[in-house]
Curated annotation (Swiss-Prot):
One Pfam family matching this protein: Tub_N
Domain of life of the organism encoding this protein: Eukaryota
InterPro entries membership: Tubby-like_C, Tubby_C, Tubby_C_CS, Tubby_N
Name of the protein: Tubby-related protein 2
GO MF entry, a single one: protein-containing complex binding
Modification sites for Phosphothreonine: 211
Record family assignment: Belongs to the TUB family.
Region annotated Disordered, chain positions: 1-81, 179-294
PANTHER family associated with the record: TUBBY-RELATED (PTHR16517), TUBBY-RELATED PROTEIN 2 (PTHR16517:SF24)
Amino acid sequence: MDREGPRGPRSGASQENEQWKKETLEDEFSGVRLQKLEQQRQLFEKKQRRKRQEPLMVQANPDATLRHRRPRRGEERFQSDSSWGLGVGSPFLQENVPQAHLPSGAHSALVTMSYVADGSGERAPLLSPRGAVYTRGNGPAVRHHLCWLPDSSDSDVEEVTMEDIPVISRPPQTNLANLRRGWLASPGPGISQEEKEEEVGSTDARVEDKTPSPDPDPDPTVNSDGDHGDLAPCKVEENTAQKNTETASGIGDEDREKGEVTESTETNYAPVASKVLQGDDGDASNHNAWNMTCPQPRIPGPRLGEDMEAYVLLPAPRDHMVQCRIVRNKHGMDKGMFPSYYLYLEAEDGVAHFLLAGRKRKRSKTSNYLISLDPKDMSRNGSNFVGKVRSNVLGTKFTIFDNGVNPERSYWVPDSARIREELGVVCYETNVLGFRGPRKMTVILPGMDSRKQRMKVQPQNDQDSILSRVQKGAGHGLLLLQNKAPSWSDESGAYVLNFHGRVTRASVKNFQIVHPDEPDHLVLQFGRVAPNIFTMDFRYPLCPLQAFAICLSSFDGKLAFF
């Protein structure tokens, strides 16, 4: 009994020691397991980050906070309008207008997209769109969602908010070089803040139209200055003829380009065609500007099946002033930095015939405007490309070319290719007043021969160009034009020009081109009539392409004017 007494405590201590060792091993195993789990988690997160950085993957912005937007007002009203057939797919809008010519601003999307990643790097197919935000003018909008179908329940879900995504149906591919139809013009969207600043807000430097009161029985072929064949005084509707002076040039210029973005192959669309020349629903001035009627007869538009490339290069008739409209479209992915411009001819049948479309090239060292016969395809390599306007670094000198090839790049051009032809040069000069004074322009054109045909100028290098010839004093065979200097009016405190009722809004872009020896004989005049609508009237020896290119140069920003 005495020997067994001490064994009891020793056995209890050994059991406690074994239990302590067991707990220690379990703690070590659990620690190793946690370390392995942590390493696996880090590897998984690293793999997910690499997958998200791959191209064509929708990436989330961790700094952005998702906000729940309240539904806009008037959704029920928009749905009721759509039920009455007033939507984009209405047959009333598509009866005489091809779907390809619906404006890109007719649809605007505010879509919240979500996708599901499952570690495999693949995504499920996209659900059929349950809708988007369709707006008409300033009307209401309806918000819908798009999402990716999940592949598994263990996936990571991320949301991305994408704004200003145009919802545009793919237009049919048609070649418009052979057959052209007359598409009616419609002005662009409402006025923006930049355009409000561009229009004159003060009386320091603006140009007012000092159109005299028309005679009781004016001769439609004689203008207010007594010149035959010039612009005749236009008759405006009673609700717009409140006074005889109309603003024509003002402070400010086009908003400057803030940066060049990578050029994409997006499709441009002409404004919606309509049978009546009308303005924006929310701007009464647009409506008034489009309802002005002029007693002077207009020239007929292009015939169906006529070669449009030859038509836009043909000089205007000698005894007629060709009246046109330019519509600017500033909606799209570029957010107004690279708008599109559409030229329409106001024909004698009361219909505006589409002639040309132009846009500024994005990936270019200097300002470069491409001009095409197709409003849907304004690319350099398109079959309907007819010309371009290129500027120097300062944006003060613009050269107009046709669709020929550059002779300095003959190493990759076939021998059968036609060398490009220079159609003119536009030079802008700075003035002492800067923005507070009118622009000074000089237009240099190739001369006309005895058959009233334009002389060909096809320089092989820069030393043979029109601008170099003028700088060297060899101006033989060239025609020099300049803008008509406005006069200062003490009564209105502004520079004034007589635009004969064709210009109704103040803008620094408004100008008149005349011959130096005949200041009362207008060759080209350009001015604003609505926020995104401008008139362009020209005559011999200009052709539609030359006149349109000169006006495009007026839209471009001038670095030398800063």
